[in-house]
């Protein structure tokens, strides 16, 4: 396997591991058709703000989720341009 293919495999493994978490996977499905702020996700999942932010950071770091800032608010949505969007 060449280096580029190996890098792609490693990236796919990383993404699939992150999506193996039930909360993150359900967030991805929710964000597929909706843009949400952290406070909305806290209410939906009945979880702490730091916990929700941690999930979103992991999804943002691999570019499956994108953010849009409006004043003090940050809105999250699915990054449908990511080549791994199909896994969702």
Where on the chain are the PLM-derived regions?
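Helix-turn-helix DNA-binding motif, specifically the short coil turn and the N-cap/start of the second
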Residues: 48-51
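Residues within the DNA-recognition helix of helix-turn-helix
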Residues: 55
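Short capping segments at the starts of secondary-structure elements
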Residues: 22, 33-37
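N-terminal positioning helix adjacent to the helix-turn-helix/winged-helix DNA-binding module
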Residues: 8-11, 23
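Beta-hairpin "wing" of winged helix-turn-helix
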Residues: 40, 60-70, 77-78
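Conserved segment of winged-helix/HTH DNA-binding domains
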Residues: 11-12, 16, 75-88
């Amino acid at each position: 396997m060449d280096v580029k293919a190996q890098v792609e495999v490693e990236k796919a493994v990383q993404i699939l591991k992150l999506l193996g978490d039930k909360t993150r996977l359900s967030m991805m499905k929710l964000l597929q058709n909706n843009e949400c702020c952290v406070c909305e996700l806290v209410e939906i999942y009945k979880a702490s703000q730091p916990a929700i932010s941690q999930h979103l950071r992991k999804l943002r770091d691999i570019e499956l989720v994108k953010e849009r800032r409006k004043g003090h608010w940050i809105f999250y949505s699915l990054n449908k341009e990511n080549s791994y969007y199909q896994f969702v």
